[in-house]
Every structure is written in structure tokens, then in C-alpha cells.
Amino acid sequence: MIAYKQFTLKVLHIAPECSPLAKKGGLGDVVGTLPKALKKQGIDARVLLPAWPGVIERAQEMGRLKKEPIGEISVALNWRAYTASVLEAEVNGTHIYLLDQPELFSDPCIYPEKLDASTVLPFIFLSFAPFELLRLTGWKPQFLHAHDWTTAPVSAALKWHRYYSYFNGDYDTVFTIHNLAFQGIIDPYVLEGWGFSPKAFSNLDMDSMEYFGQVNMMKGAITTTEAFTTVSPSYSDRKRVV
């Protein structure tokens, strides 16, 4: 009799917050608890999180942190390579990958007061990092789950990025809206430096990131992801647009 290995669904959450390591609002609570709930359903759910100031120290105190990085990843942005060390931790039963990149992830407040080409760069790195991380680890999830505008470019990259679009078909994506008020709206000149093709900002394509002459990162996620959700059914009802 042939014994078949049981199929395990794998999900990687990409987010700027994950309680208790980094939390500014409800997003951190969701990302901190959802993987544990999925694990109870037999799903291998992990988190990719920036190592903001204090995160590594908290991971050491609250869980198990491997002493040495498992490797490095590099992402090309604005015609230069940004390199991050990748650390692994387990906190409250959740497997977490930490991106240690002090140049980008140095703001203890996490979110910038104003969006411009420099202040959004940490979140673009975070959005592109999964594609490099998964080659490093050899762990391949079926789903990449992005949260809010800060990781909205994950699914957009699979459609329009000059390099990462080659991974289209390798992963399905899910996008969760936690706060519709912040959509990641920025001047369009940044797209070329991030590696997006001109199609990402075509006013002839309603699915593009173009939004009244600006880039709307959340719109790009909604139109390119396989599935999008809101943080709760009641939030969906309040924000529904016909």
C-alpha cells in the first residue's frame, strides 16, 4: 500500500506589525494571532516582519531566536541593492522571519507622517522581500498574505514588476484591508525606481495603480490579488461601496 504524504497548506503573512514584537494598532494584533489560529487548523502559517528598533531584543526575551542569521537577501530599489540579514524566531508558537536592515527599518514609530519616495522605501523592500526570502529558505507557501497599503505591492509586483512578475503563477495572494483611510497614495515617478513596468500606471487600464494621476498602492493590491478581505465583516459592511 502506498503511503502518501499529507498535504500541508502554507501561508506567509507579510506585515509591518506583529504583536507582541511590533505593534501600533489593530493590524499588529491580527497578524500576531491569526497564524496561531491557522496553525490549529493544520496550516503552516508564518510571518515576515521588519526588525524595527527593539524587535530583536523582544524576540530574545519572549521566544526563541536563532543566534545567527540564516542568510541575507538583497532587493534592488532606486538602482541600488539593499541587503538585509534574515533571522528566525518563534514567539508564542508562531514562526517569524525578521528582516534586519537598520538603514531602512530604523523608525521606532514604524509609520511615516508623510509619504514620499524615501519614507515608503522600507515598505517596498518589505513587499518585495518574500520573493527573495523564499529562495533563501526553500520553504514555499502557496499563499502570500499582505496587509494594508504597507505590503500592498506584493500582488502588484507579481503582475507588473520587471523581475518579480516571473514568479506569477508560483503563489496565490490574499490582501486584507485593516484601515481603508490610508491607501498608500504617492507620486507616480517612484514606480520606475521600484522596478515596475509602465503598465502599472496606465490610465487605460482600470486595474492599474493609477488613481487620479497618483499611485494608489491599495488599489493595485485590490485589483491584482486573488482574494481580498477586510479585518471583520462589520468593517466590510461599513466601508462597502456599490
Where are each of the predicted segments found?
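Catalytic cores of nucleotide-sugar-dependent glycosyltransferases that transfer UDP/GDP/TDP-activated
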Residues: 1-242
